[in-house]
Amino acid sequence: MPEVILSAQELVKHYPIKKGVLRRTAGQVKAVDGVSFDLHKGETLGIVGESGCGKSTLGRLLMRLEEPTAGKVIFEGADWSSASGREMRRMRRDIQIVFQDPYTSLNPRTTVGDIIGEPFEIHKDVVPKGGRRRRVQELLDLVGLNPEHINRYPHQFSGGQRQRIGIARGIALNPMVLVCDEPVSALDVSVQAQVVNLMEKLQDELGLAYVFIAHDLSVVRHISDRVGVMYLGRMAELGEEDEVYSRPTHPYTQALLSAVPVPDPTLRGKRDQIVLVGDVPSPANPPSGCRFHTRCWKAQELCSQEEPQLEMRADGAGEHLSACHFAEPRTIVETVDVSDLEPDARFVATDLRDDALAADAPVDLDQMAERSGQLHGDAGYAPQEVTRLIDEQPGDHRPSDG
């Protein structure tokens, strides 16, 4: 096991609720309430959960962009949460952040060269080899952008390109840890894949460790080595990616995974989807005991009286922790061999995998189109428009010829 580079110890962040003319404190929003975990060198720790569970606040606490109400952040053996301003400046070279929204995290009045080169202005004792401009061009090339675009402004780039600029800024000082606060949630799916693949490439080349915060379970599974699941400011489950996704032990994790669409139609009927009842309680007034007991189908009297601890379960593999009094593994979707099964009658009409295709014979596209009764085309080909011309009576959509 690689050495621990970053450790969160019982992190707490409560925001006061002010009311009245005198702005007196009338309560607290418990955004993060006792979260602990370790991050090892070169690994990716994924943090998932519903909106409002405290994921982004946790990321800001790790960066000390928010001062914790209680708890510690230990970075390379030093207490980050109590460091002085001078010590923080030195330590921030080694831990950087990529923000969620690429449209608001970049200054629209500043060129890309100045945005990526800004860390060298703050840390003047860090002099890049070959000069600042050359280093910025190297970073642009490293993240897959044209170095000649160094003098362009953010509005001249797409969303995916802007996020690449944010990543280039984050790795400018060669950090050891990169906190990624939902870096792909504002991007299209195809662009998400490009950014995630870029981050994996940079991790291999630079030896980075990621804290990857997201709400997309598929993206987190693709990139993470370990996964932590948060609910109402607390960690519900933490373990190796394979264990958490294939054998989740916490009811909340099981419910989340049961809602993920199954691409194989032959397996959809083999999974029981768990439907949670009720709404997420307010973090200003969380339930007593286990915070999930108001929506949990396993809840008993003990759950409302005693808060479960995040503990290792005897039947789990490796370091698989779960905060549940009645934690037990549950297989969400079984992976079964369906090669000998009869195809589902609903899909027979469109199943084109015949013996000729299985034998790698030449494919007759006209025959496939005739059998399927469908029209196919790339973007811009407009098969829907062709279908409409065939089905509708002559009128406004009459073809120009043919």
Which sequence ranges carry the predicted segments?
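P-loop NTP-binding/switch modules centered on Walker-like glycine-rich loops
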Residues: 176-179, 183-187, 191-269
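ABC ATPase NBD coupling module
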Residues: 21-26, 80-96, 114, 122, ...
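Short catalytic/signature loops enriched in Gly
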Residues: 2-4, 17-23, 28, 240-353
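Helix-to-loop junction immediately C-terminal to a conserved catalytic motif
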Residues: 63
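Conserved ABC ATPase signature
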Residues: 153-157, 161
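Conserved ABC ATPase "signature" region
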Residues: 79, 130-148, 257-258
